Amino acid sequence: MSPQPRKVVHADIKPENPPDLASRYLDVPNMPWEKTKFPGIEIKVLYSDSGITTALFRMAPGAVVPLHEHTALEQTYVLEGTLEDHEGVCGPGQFVWRPAGNQHEAVAPNGAVLLGFFLKPNRFAYGEKFFTEEEAK
């Protein structure tokens, strides 16, 4: 069975976005993994603005994100491996979200690749900074 041709709903409208409103396409597989301040954790920042961050994380087996508090909603989708904390385990294809004020330490016992969405930078127990705009400067 061959795919149906795409139906154009508004063929009479040709949207033209100015450069500041244009879509941004990223070649994620060819982006380099960047080291973080935490051993065994690398990051690809896909979007960041005023604390809002979308990023891929690669965690080596046994890597730990130290104790921290989410200052706003945090969402994580696990692509590979598992992410564990004192509240549960999130495996491949699973999703976890944490409300503002949630505190935890996360570990990837066998390694993991995660897609994370943050509305504001986290507050770490010992003052560490992690994937914040200040680090990028």
Predicted feature descriptions by range:
Residues 1-51, 131-137:
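A short, N-terminal "cap"/entry segment at the start of jelly-roll beta-barrel domains
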Residues 36-70, 89, 99-103:
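Conserved short histidine dyad/triad with adjacent acidic residue
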Residues 57, 77, 116-117:
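Preference for bulky hydrophobic residues occupying beta-strand positions
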Residues 61, 70-85, 92:
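Glycine- and acidic-residue-biased ligand/ion/polar-headgroup-sensing regions
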Residues 64, 94-95, 113:
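Residue-level marker of beta-strand positions
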Residues 84-108:
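Short acidic-glycine-tyrosine-enriched beta hairpin
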Residues 100-127:
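Ligand-binding loop in jelly-roll beta-barrel domains
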